[in-house]
Every structure is written in structure tokens, then in C-alpha cells.
Regions:
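Acidic, contiguous N-terminal accessory segments
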Residues: 1-100
């Protein structure tokens, strides 16, 4: 799976999860607003121990989980998820990603 910039840690897991393919058509800013407001199958949690722009994104066969401490981290996670949704037309490879700016 190609994501730019390459996350600091990414583990590919078996399986896939299907998000609504229409999400792939949204521009990034609109996609971020959808993630923030709530997308079926995507759970967003606040984890105060994560750094300001740090995030964890996990895709499992049952859905997507995003953890961040604030909107900056959530935006970075949404950017990564947007790339995945766009490339796979909604079909996401299961994976565990943790990233923050270097």
C-alpha cells in the first residue's frame, strides 16, 4: 500500500473493509468534515496522550478506528484515509498505522 508521505509505522493486516465508494469523490477538506461529523463504519476517539499531530488509524474487517489528541492529528489521519479510500474506491486494506510529523 502506497501512502504519501510514508507513515512512520504501518502494518498490513489480513482482510479488507468497504467504505462507501462515494467518499472517494469528495475533496479532502469535505472528506475531513465528514470524518469529523461521523461516517458509518468510522470511529473517532480522542487520546490526550498522543502528540498534537500524531494519530493512529486502524482498518479492520469490522470498520475503521482513528485516534488523535486534537483536530490536527485527526486531519492527518483523514488525509491518510482519504488516500486509501480514493485509491481503492472505498475498499480498504486492513492495516494499523501510527504516524506523526518527523
Amino acid at each position: 500500500m502506497m501512502i504519501f508521505p510514508q507513515p512512520q509505522q504501518m502494518d498490513i493486516l489480513p482482510g479488507a473493509y468497504q467504505l462507501c465508494a462515494d467518499l472517494a469523490k469528495l475533496p479532502l477538506v469535505d472528506f475531513f468534515q465528514q470524518v469529523k461529523a461521523g461516517i458509518p463504519g468510522v470511529t473517532v476517539t480522542t487520546e490526550p496522550l498522543l502528540g498534537k499531530e500524531e494519530y493512529r488509524l486502524t482498518v479492520e474487517e469490522g470498520g475503521v478506528a482513528i485516534a488523535s489528541s486534537c483536530d490536527e492529528g485527526l486531519f492527518r489521519a483523514a488525509t491518510t484515509l482519504h488516500q486509501m479510500v480514493t485509491k481503492g474506491e472505498g475498499k480498504l486494506e486492513c492495516c494499523a498505522i501510527q504516524d506523526k510529523p518527523a
